[in-house]
Amino acid sequence: MRARRGGPPVPYKRPVQSPDADTVMLASVKTDPGVTPEPAASPPDADHPAEEPSAADQPAATRPAAEPSAAEPSAAEHWASSTRVLTLPRGKRSGPARWSAPSARRTWVSRAALAMILGVQAVLSLRLNNTASGSEALYLYAGHLEAAHLLHGAPLPGNYASYFPGVPVLYPVLGAAADSIGGLAAARAVSLLAMLVTTGLLYAMTRRLFNERTGLCAAALFGVTEGAILAGRLATSDAVSLALLALACWIVVRTASWRWRAYLLAIPVACLAAATDYWALLYLPTVAFLAGLAAHPYLSRPALVRALVLAAVMVELFAAGVLIAGRDYVTAAAAATASRTPGSGQALPILAESGKWGGLIVALAVLGAVSYALQARTEPNEHIALPGSRRRRIALGVVLAGTALLTLAAQLRLNTDISLATHAAFGLFFAAPMAGVGLARLVGDHFRRAQIGIVVWTAALILGLSQTSQFFGSWPDSSALVGELSRYLAPGARYLVENDNVAIYYLKGQPDARPGQFTSTYFIAYRTPGGQVLTGTAGFAAALRAGYFRVIIYDSTVTPALDKSLAATLESDPRYRLAGAVPENARDFRATCYVWVRD
């Protein structure tokens, strides 16, 4: 270091640098205006401290005097401390996290990962194979009847609007149109496409709420849940309704930062989702809350008005729909979402089933909600959507993770586990973003604990594989039974079949197998020759004595008490004979179907 004029050498000062800083502040000096500055010497090395140059090596102009002159100005007058700021390249710790930093390459990697997730989900659904279930058969043949009624004015055999879990002219007609083109496989393909769209929208929504990594984690977890796999393989309204609900959520998140009211586009989509399947009504408040919470980091408190506007407009639309369509739809919606099944002792089985269907995802969602509330980022300087205040983060976690528990509460209120498998998919869709946060926190920054994420996802995959296979094997292959029944069809004949929906669906188009010719063992309203209407066991017994049915089929599984009474009556009546016994075998179902025919 060069010596100052009239004073001792200036000691070397090391740069002030923080490990996480983007700049380095270097000590500097101001030269005497009368002295021409010399080129700066190379800075000393950290391992080799600066050495003072000897006086002989210095130019005469800068060689220190033996005694400072009193006439000379002091060092403080000619030399003042100052700093220079040098911007350094971003380091590993000071710059953005490499995984979360936007780049074209990572965009394509994320798209490829999403395609793989959707491919796995499709394979998991397509591997399930069985004949139509009772619910699928009901939706599809009712859709054919509704389409014929709309297009040709054909009479309907019943008032489907009074008990269907959705508006009968929506999904049933769509499913029937696909069935007309490619049969049951095409109708199921509609559901699969809807569920793949749902997973894709979940990724897009979560990516905007958090970031790319969290979106992929959420999609990977949701795609292997039992509800998503089953809904994608059943020709029912659940998948289409959930896809519409996902679209509504994506709209409110995508338009969160927009000043103009584009979020209102979510209202008709959400209402259509609820009309397709009344179960979606339970999740409309979540859509409204999500609209406000997603916009809060951008618009602050005025964003909460969005939630109120969405809720108010949706209520008005449904009120107008009820006034136009009639109270039958209200009755059906109440039955689907709020009517309690008689009986007790169902709480523990429902809790156990719910734990199997979604316990892992809900646990991850709770973990994600807590960790997100405590700390917005997984790693320092992680690229993430505006997290907002801690209150906002807590509210978002409670709304998303808590919606999964709403499904459980609704099933406990209904006192039944019927349709729990597909209903769980609705709640898990909303919990999946927070579950993605939880999985990302378990994995850690820079995939530090990737093995934990692999173990968790593998556990979810194994649960999805085992439970969906078990569910899809809970009803038997009906091919043999339908073939046996088709041998005894006759013009104007009546058929008593335990599950008549399946027979009606597979025999559609047969002139002697119209829906009005079938009766199930669930209910009968038989009018005697004297004009008296009998229901229940008395009605079935009176119909058998009168020879009302040509074919009677039962398997003692759904209505065992009634089937036992039917068997006793048929065995004592010489007009009926046992035409066959068809075994019904499935993975978790064993029964024998008895076919009685009146000669």
Name the predicted role of every residue range:
Residues 1-41, 45-50, 55-56, 60-124, ...:
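Start-transfer (signal-anchor) and selected internal transmembrane alpha helices
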Residues 471-479, 485-529, 541, 545-562, ...:
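Short periplasmic/luminal acceptor-recognition loop of GT-C membrane glycosyltransferases, typified by
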Residues 209, 213, 248-263, 273, ...:
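Membrane-interface transmembrane helices that cradle and orient dolichyl/undecaprenyl
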Residues 231-232, 238-241, 282, 414-447:
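Hydrophobic/aromatic-rich transmembrane helices and adjacent perimembrane loops
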Residues 114, 312-315, 383-393, 437-466:
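Signature aromatic-anchored transmembrane alpha helix within multi-pass, membrane-resident enzymes
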Residues 133, 191, 227-240:
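Short acidic/glycine- and proline-prone juxtamembrane loop motifs at membrane-interface regions
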Residues 142-145, 284-379, 397, 403-418, ...:
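Transmembrane-lumen/periplasm boundary regions of multi-pass, lipid-linked membrane glycan transferases
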Residues 121-123, 138-166, 170-173:
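Extracytosolic helix-loop segments that constitute the early lumenal/periplasmic catalytic or substrate-binding loops
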